[in-house]
Swiss-Prot record:
Keyword Endoplasmic reticulum: no
Pfam families cross-referenced by the UniProt entry: EFG_C, EFG_III, GTP_EFTU, GTP_EFTU_D2, LepA_C
A cellular-component GO term for this protein: plasma membrane
Family statement drawn from the similarity comment of this UniProt entry: Belongs to the TRAFAC class translation factor GTPase superfamily. Classic translation factor GTPase family. LepA subfamily.
Protein name: Elongation factor 4
Domain tr-type G: 30-212
GO MF term (any one): GTPase activity
Binding site for GTP: 42-47, 159-162
Keyword set, alphabetical order: Cell inner membrane, Cell membrane, GTP-binding, Hydrolase, Membrane, Nucleotide-binding, Protein biosynthesis
EC number annotated for this UniProt entry: 3.6.5.n1
Cellular compartments annotated: Cell inner membrane
Length: 627
């Protein structure tokens, strides 16, 4: 994310680029174009951004790396964009004018929809990039509707037209039928070969409106993203809506009221270019000596401390995590390093929430809130890769709304927090609306999967040779493996997007796992009563395979309250104590066997069963086994 090179001090480039004399602010604003690219994973967005950078001459051919903006190794490896990025480019159009193009990158995955809404809010236009061989995906549809709601000018673009499998006519028809844009206006390009890039840049300049705003008004700048830099502290990526941001100004963060002094301003081209001011309509970075991570909340508004704006930039909501999991370091010595790593990560990721948690089985760790499963995987992988931590993650859960008999409403993030059954009046589970686009030949398998996940069909319509399905289903059913299984039953052709709808009453119970009579809090799950018996049986069988045999018998039980619904037993290892007896009286052997039996009984009372790490993932594997 516009981040700095990891080795050595940041390389600075200063220069006369992007001059914006304040007397000509309004004239200059007319030559700014702020735009975003909406695209599904792997439809060529990062490659197109590279072509723009190359075309404007911002980097020499030697400096161009593939996917310049995807600066995290993880982003390049998985081929997805996770963070919002920005790059400012100069483009001399055919009308002879030089335009400033501010491209704000957006992630494409469903988990990162909040990052998309922030990026789109800072733009006046968007390019809808669709792979000409694959067609429109559910994800792009959702992000495109967000852009339409925010009043952006949308330019449809067909990418990868150089592929033999591309079918532009079919995709144009899809764009018209599914999204409702005029497909005939779609531009045909190949980001890989550079074909059609010039025409696309001209269309950007002609069709995307210039930013609106009052250069004379009080400063109002939206924080699109922020990240932590080892040299500079917090760096914020901002879009100026009104007024101007100048070096040396005292600025105020509107939600917290905290004040800072601007030390550095500038753009990414994608090199860092320092400037003395950012004017209305411009996008750039601000360094203001913010040392702690909560100093620049993403989605907040910066204003002048001397002459503050009356109201912040509208339309931003605090993002709510939907999926929770306990994350614990394997070594308790790493706890403080783990806390620091999470705090640093949270600066780059406003949607990550965490609070300390103690588990009898796993020790000290954190209960972390994520946007979805991909978000959870990426956070865990970044913690392990960038901070060298070794972590155990418990099975993910969703938030449940619980009405107690006292009339109190609780939000439960962790099954172990659920009150006793006699204290619960009602449990409500989160329901989502899942939009699925699937080719006709796979629709039967997809419907079967949705029904298995307790889904209720709300809509079904034919769109060319694709079928658009809308299902309402419990989020708890989706969170573990729905996405993987959807890809599996549709041979990888189905695409999926979801949004939270409401909490709805359901007959849910907590299944506890007891090992030798002791509850293991990290293995508890909340499931529908109809599935409790089979889920408990699968869980105990799985744990029986994983827990090693001890010198004494180990009982594994699944229980709802005090009612045991399933049990497995790990048989004891047995030493042959009578081996040293040869012949002789049977009472001698019996005495040795009785002694062994008494010893095992005593051992069972005081012995602790070591639970291996894989046991905590067994909850996940129980679901995967069904796929």
């Amino acid at each position: 994310m516009g981040a700095l090179p990891s080795g050595g001090a940041p390389k600075l480039v200063t220069g006369p680029r992007f001059r914006s004399p304040s007397s000509h602010s309004r004239v200059y604003m007319n030559r700014i174009r702020n735009f975003s690219i909406i695209a599904h994973i792997d439809h060529g967005k990062s490659t197109l951004a590279d072509r723009f950078i190359q075309h404007s001459g911002a980097l020499s051919n030697r400096e161009m790396a593939e996917q310049v903006l995807d600066s995290m190794d993880l982003e390049r490896e998985r081929g997805i964009t996770i963070k919002a990025q920005s790059v400012s480019l100069e483009y001399r159009a055919k009308d002879g004018q030089t335009y400033e193009l501010n491209f704000i990158d957006t992630p494409g995955h469903v988990d990162f929809s909040y990052e998309v809404s922030r990026s789109l809010f800072a733009c006046e236009g968007a390019l809808l990039v669709v792979d000409a061989s694959q067609g429109v995906e559910a994800q792009s549809v959702a992000n495109c509707y967000t852009a339409v709601d925010q009043g952006l000018e949308i330019i449809p673009v067909l990418n990868k037209i150089d592929l033999p499998s591309s079918d532009p006519q079919r995709v144009i028809q899809q764009i018209e039928e599914i999204i409702g844009l005029d497909g005939e206006e779609a531009l045909k390009i190949s980001a890989k070969t550079g074909e059609g890039i010039e025409e696309l840049l001209e269309a950007l300049v002609q069709r995307v409106p210039a930013p609106k705003g009052d250069p004379e008004a009080a400063l109002k700048a939206l924080i699109i993203d922020s990240w932590f830099d080892n040299y500079l502290g917090v760096v914020a990526l901002v879009r100026v809506f009104d007024g101007a941001l100048k070096k040396g100004d005292r600025i105020r963060v509107m939600s917290t009221g905290r004040e800072f002094q601007v030390d550095e301003l500038g753009f990414f081209t994608p090199k860092r270019v320092l400037r003395d001011r950012l004017d209305t309509g411009q996008v750039g970075f601000v360094v203001a000596g913010i040392k702690d991570i909560d100093g620049a909340p993403v989605g907040d508004t910066l204003t002048s401390a001397q002459k503050p704006a009356d109201s912040p930039v509208p339309g931003f909501k605090k993002v709510q995590p939907r999926v929770f999991a306990g994350v614990f370091p394997t070594s308790s010595d790493d706890f403080e390093n783990f806390r620091t790593a999470l705090e640093k990560l949270r600066l780059n990721d406003a949607s990550l929430h965490f609070e300390p948690e103690t588990s009898q089985a796993l020790g000290f760790g954190f209960r972390c809130g994520f946007l979805g499963m991909l978000h959870m995987e990426i956070v865990q992988e970044r913690l392990e890769r960038e901070y060298g931590l070794d972590l155990i993650t418990t099975a993910p859960t969703v938030v449940h709304e619980v009405l107690t008999t006292d009339g109190e409403t609780l939000y439960i993030h962790n099954p172990s927090e659920l009150p006793a059954p006699n204290k619960i009046e009602d449990i409500r589970e989160p329901i989502i609306a899942a939009s699925i686009l699937v080719p006709e030949e796979h629709v039967g398998n997809v419907i079967k999967l949705c029904v298995e996940k307790r889904g209720v069909q709300k809509e079904m319509q034919y769109v060319g040779n694709q079928i658009s399905l809308v299902y309402e289903m419990p989020m708890g059913e989706v969170v573990l493996d729905f996405f993987d299984r959807l890809k599996s039953v549709s041979r990888g052709f189905a695409s999926f997007d979801y949004e939270f709808k409401r909490f709805q009453s359901a007959d849910l119970v907590k299944v506890d796992v007891l090992i030798n009579g002791d509850k293991v809090d990290a293995l508890a799950v909340i499931v529908h009563r109809d599935q409790a018996q089979s889920r408990g049986r699968e869980l105990t069988d799985k744990l029986k395979e994983i827990i090693p045999r001890q010198m004494f018998e180990v009982a594994i039980q699944a229980a709802i309250g005090n009612h045991v619904i399933a049990r497995s037993t790990v048989k004891a290892l047995r030493k042959n104590v009578t081996a040293k007896c040869y012949g002789g009286d049977i009472s001698r052997k019996r005495k040795l066997l009785e002694k062994q039996k008494a010893g095992k009984k005593r051992m069972k009372q005081v012995g602790k069963v070591e639970i291996p790490q894989e046991a905590f993932l067994a909850v996940l594997q129980v679901d995967n086994k069904k796929s």
